[in-house]
């Protein structure tokens, strides 16, 4: 099969992609300028479909709506870096802080520290 056809078959919209997320899933997103803001926006648009979805990342640069108190029943925020957008939710107990150096992140998953 031609790679271009395979690529075309996998194309989807953000709204369609986030419908695959189920309650209790873990979503690991890029951080800082690599944060997938369109996907996070689609997740927020669909938040009523979720309960207990864990969102893991380091530095959040966008609005981080999933950190807000009104979204606590939908999302558990697991921050690997306590930045400005996540600090309040960590201090209020609505988020988990997993301190980690950037170079250690692959080990969190390969050694099942974050199972």
Q: What is the meaning of each model-derived region?
A:
Residues 1-115:
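Conserved alpha/beta enzyme-core scaffold
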